[in-house]
């Protein structure tokens, strides 16, 4: 993907962000060498420096933006879009007491929006602003790279307004989001989860490629669009102030694009200057400040919709008073707690936010108030953190947490299995040769290792064949082109019960063991080596053989 960063248009109002969507007829000049007529932008970086002119204390009359005023809701709504906004503020009664908070703890429940998340607000606002500017016209196509919730909001609005909608989202995102998007009539394109945001394979890169190929298409670009924070400045923040009678001492919000926390915080800084703004960023993301908070070996996380590997343009980190990092285990634990103890059917990022809130609000006293933003609903995660099996497989629940009667073999170790010597291939072996080896040896998959035996990834017969049939690779290409790293590992000391949970959702697990290697410098390092590959057939054969011997 080209690294050039075209400058966003700045209209006569001096709008600091891109004032509308990126259309296929945009005015950003970027074409082929020597082609002076070409004005087609290849892409615009979602982390371009912001040129926003907002300043605390600056009169609202000097704002270059169109601002909306909340309308009184009629008894009969003209369409579902009128059910976006005006979400309830609900008191948290048990969790605050459980963690010894003295202050009042309130939840702004954004999953009561029509599409089920806080992103409904920005989706509607971006489309309305684009329509008002004359950029988005009937019959046009909306394309958006998203983790899912913005896509649902856009697809919902597009269904009502009559636009074609294409959503580009990473493979990590839940199947429930995909199902909802399809039901709303959206077209869906999936991208690799581990692709960097600036690579052609990322959800951002693929969205821009589609935009450049499809006539009359537009990327509304939640990462750069001023309508994102403006939606929260004009509506969400005003609702919070009204619901709290202007009295709140702390606001806690998880951060993705940054539009929610930026818009709300700017309004609160103006109207309630004593309120502390707390930002929540998952471990593996780089949004938090100071930079030391982001230092970790972790690069992936399960919680969806928050955190990024770049700083979105719309995120104003200067309005955040303090950052906290959150992890997956506490996120899903607190999300389940909110459901079980408060009856709030919220998603995983709400758990991240609440987990941080009970830490940050320890400094507040009686008579003070903390507001927590709960971004989306549990609807999107029915097969994820709401599932005990999924939680067990991911290691967020322990076997003893579930009081079920286990079979006799449950607590035996993986080392009890009679695993054959592993078949491994080097990344330089051709796809054609690898397929021949797997067929000859009767295997469906094999670990890919380097010359030293260090695990690089896995390759499966099915994945190679589908890649060849789709023309993604040639038979002579190295197998390193089709390896993937999203597979489950298990150790010899793990239980067969844990293996069973993995095999309920995956076709195989890679059995590994640690090796300590000493270097000439006197230092040592630990690396994982392949011990074998185990499948459901291996487990079933072991159980059947043991029961046969006992008879």
UniProtKB/Swiss-Prot annotation:
Record's catalysed reaction(s): L-homocysteine + L-serine = L,L-cystathionine + H2O
Entry EC number(s): 4.2.1.22
Family annotation (InterPro entries): CBS_C (IPR046353), CBS_dom (IPR000644), CBS_dom_sf (IPR046342), Cys_Synth/Cystath_Beta-Synth (IPR050214), Cysta_beta_synth (IPR005857), P-phosphate_BS (IPR001216), TrpB-like_PALP (IPR001926), TrpB-like_PALP_sf (IPR036052)
Keyword Amino-acid biosynthesis: yes
Signal peptide: none
Similarity comment: Belongs to the cysteine synthase/cystathionine beta-synthase family.
Protein name, per record: Cystathionine beta-synthase
Origin species: Macaca fascicularis
């Amino acid at each position: 993907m080209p690294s050039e960063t075209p400058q966003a248009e700045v209209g006569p109002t001096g709008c600091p962000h891109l004032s509308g969507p990126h259309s296929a007829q945009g005015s950003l000049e970027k074409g082929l060498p020597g082609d002076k007529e070409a004005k087609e932008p290849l892409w615009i970086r979602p982390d371009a420096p912001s040129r926003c002119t907002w300043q605390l204390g600056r009169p609202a009359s000097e704002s270059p933006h169109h601002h909306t005023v909340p309308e009184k809701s009629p008894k009969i709504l003209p369409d579902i879009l009128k059910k976006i906004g005006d979400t309830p503020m609900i008191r948290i009664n048990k969790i605050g007491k459980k963690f010894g908070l003295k202050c009042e703890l309130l939840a702004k429940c954004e999953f009561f929006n029509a599409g089920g998340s806080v992103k409904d607000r920005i989706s509607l606002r971006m489309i309305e602003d684009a329509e008002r500017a004359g950029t988005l016209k009937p019959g046009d196509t909306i394309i958006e790279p998203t983790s899912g919730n913005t896509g649902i909001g856009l697809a919902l609005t597009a269904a009502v307004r009559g636009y074609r909608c294409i959503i580009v989202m990473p493979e990590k995102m839940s199947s429930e989001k995909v199902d909802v998007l399809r039901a709303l009539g959206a077209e869906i394109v999936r991208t690799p989860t581990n692709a960097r945001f600036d690579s052609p394979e990322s959800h951002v890169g693929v969205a821009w490629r589609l935009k450049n190929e499809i006539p009359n298409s537009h990327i509304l670009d939640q990462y750069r669009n001023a309508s994102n924070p403006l939606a929260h400045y004009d509506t969400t923040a005003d609702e919070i102030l009204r619901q709290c009678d202007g009295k709140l001492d702390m606001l806690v919000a998880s951060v993705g694009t940054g539009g929610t926390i930026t818009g709300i915080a700017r309004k609160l800084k103006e109207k309630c200057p004593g309120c502390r703004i707390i930002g929540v960023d998952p471990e593996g993301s780089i949004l938090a400040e100071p930079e030391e908070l982001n230092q970790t070996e972790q690069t992936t996380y399960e919680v969806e919709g928050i955190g990024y590997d770049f700083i979105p343009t719309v995120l104003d980190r200067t309005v955040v008073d303090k950052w906290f990092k959150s992890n997956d285990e506490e996120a899903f634990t607190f999300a389940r707690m909110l459901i079980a103890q408060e009856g709030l059917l919220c998603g995983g990022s709400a758990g991240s936010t609440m987990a941080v809130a009970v830490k940050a609000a320890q400094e507040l006293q009686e008579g003070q108030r903390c507001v927590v933003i709960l971004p989306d609903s549990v609807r999107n995660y029915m097969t994820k953190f709401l599932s005990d099996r999924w939680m067990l497989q991911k290691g967020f629940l322990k076997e003893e947490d579930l009081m079920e009667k286990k079979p006799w073999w449950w607590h035996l170790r993986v080392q009890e299995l009679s695993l054959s010597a592993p078949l491994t291939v080097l990344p330089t072996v051709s796809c054609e040769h690898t397929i021949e080896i797997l067929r000859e040896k009767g295997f469906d998959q094999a670990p890919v290792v380097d010359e030293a035996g260090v695990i690089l990834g896995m390759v499966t017969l099915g994945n190679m064949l589908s890649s060849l049939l789709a023309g993604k690779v040639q038979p002579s290409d190295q197998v390193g082109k089709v390896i993937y790293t999203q597979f489950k590992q298990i150790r010899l000391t793990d239980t067969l019960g844990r293996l069973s949970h993995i095999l309920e959702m995956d076709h195989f697990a890679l059995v590994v063991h640690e090796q300590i290697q000493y270097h000439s410098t006197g230092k040592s390092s630990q690396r994982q080596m392949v011990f074998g590959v185990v499948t459901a057939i291996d487990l079933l054969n072991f159980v059947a053989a043991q029961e046969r011997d006992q008879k």
